[in-house]
Regions:
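Gram-negative bacterial Sec-dependent N-terminal signal peptides
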Residues: 1-27
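An edge-strand/N-cap motif at the start of beta-rich repeat modules
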Residues: 26-45
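Conserved beta-propeller blade signature
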Residues: 29-33, 72-75, 118-122, 129, ...
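Loop/turn residues immediately N-terminal
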Residues: 36-40, 71, 79-83, 126-128, ...
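Short loop/turn segments that connect beta-strands within beta-propeller blades
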Residues: 44-47, 86-90, 132-136, 191-194, ...
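A short beta-strand motif characteristic of beta-propeller blades
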Residues: 48-56, 91-102, 140-152, 196-206, ...
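Structural signature of eukaryotic scaffold interfaces centered on beta-propeller domains
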Residues: 63-71, 102-118, 154-172, 209-222, ...
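Blade-level signature of beta-propeller repeat domains, shared across WD40, Kelch, NHL, RCC1
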Residues: 243-266
């Protein structure tokens, strides 16, 4: 039986051979989180699930991401443990436990790495935490709020997913983008530690999905491609306008995709 890692490699090769060179160069494998702790694998160019795996050693994952600093897949559990996930076996190994708790409700929880600082951004509602992934030390950053001059100034943001650009190695610069479910728009977190937000533009989705999962694929040369899994549909998102363009239905999943992590192209 193929392991998840082997399936990721095979899927990426197949997708690359099925499309033109320009698209093939940026085709990459994606991990999706469904249910409480199930990982699914598909490709950015062909969103058909080719492998599923339950993560062992945890009860529930609230989010996942790829950590560029050490090239591992990281998950965060509902009890604030940071775990490393072995893609060969599905086993989760605790790396650290956060020393400050994030009040969790039914609202989505944001889990994403700042590749430049090698710190984990951990947010829900308007609460904005920055976490050392090896020690669990939490810095409580500024409350999320739209900045002065933004058309949504004074409104309560509803940030449900986030991602950083240039997530490859340790870049010299990065930028953070979010999805606001109330507005249905792409938002830039202009000063991530301060929590300041600026609306970029509407996604333009026909129907409001139950879940939003967002990540940005960084490549050598500074190219960044944003992907949004809205329910069971995969889109690319223009980081300059916010407009979403349909890639295709994520086939082979039983429930909506709650989070995604784009892995380096193999």
């Amino acid at each position: 039986m193929k392991t998840l890692r082997h399936a990721l490699i095979a899927s990426s090769i197949l997708a690359a051979s099925a499309v033109t060179g320009a698209v093939a160069a940026s085709a990459a494998p994606v991990l999706g989180l469904t249910g409480d702790k199930t990982l699914v694998m598909f490709d950015t160019a062909k969103p058909e699930v080719t492998k599923t795996m339950d993560v062992t050693g945890v009860t529930k994952l609230v989010g996942i991401d790829f950590r560029p600093g050490n090239k591992t897949v990281i998950g965060v559990t509902a009890d604030h443990a940071i775990v490393s996930i072995n893609l060969e076996t599905g086993a989760a190994t605790e790396v650290a436990k956060m020393d400050k708790m994030l009040t969790m409700t039914e609202a989505p929880v944001v889990v994403d790495f700042n590749p430049m600082a090698d710190r984990l951004r951990f947010m829900t509602g308007t609460t904005n935490h920055r976490v050392h992934p090896d020690t669990g030390a939490v810095t409580v950053d500024g409350t999320l709020a739209f900045e002065e001059g933004d058309m949504h100034k004074g409104e309560t943001p509803n940030i449900v997913s986030a991602a950083y650009t240039n997530s490859i190695g340790k870049p010299e610069k990065t930028a953070m983008y979010n999805i606001d479910a109330t507005i249905g728009a792409l938002i830039q977190q202009t000063k991530p530690n301060d929590g300041t937000l600026k609306a970029i533009g509407k996604l333009g989705l026909k129907d409001k999905p139950a879940t939003y999962a967002f990540d940005i694929q960084g490549e050598e040369g500074g190219k960044n491609t944003a992907y949004l899994a809205a329910g069971k549909m995969l889109y690319t998102v223009n980081l300059e306008t916010g407009a979403a363009t349909e890639v295709g239905t994520i086939s082979g999943v039983e429930t909506d995709v709650r989070d995604i992590a784009v892995l380096p192209a193999m």
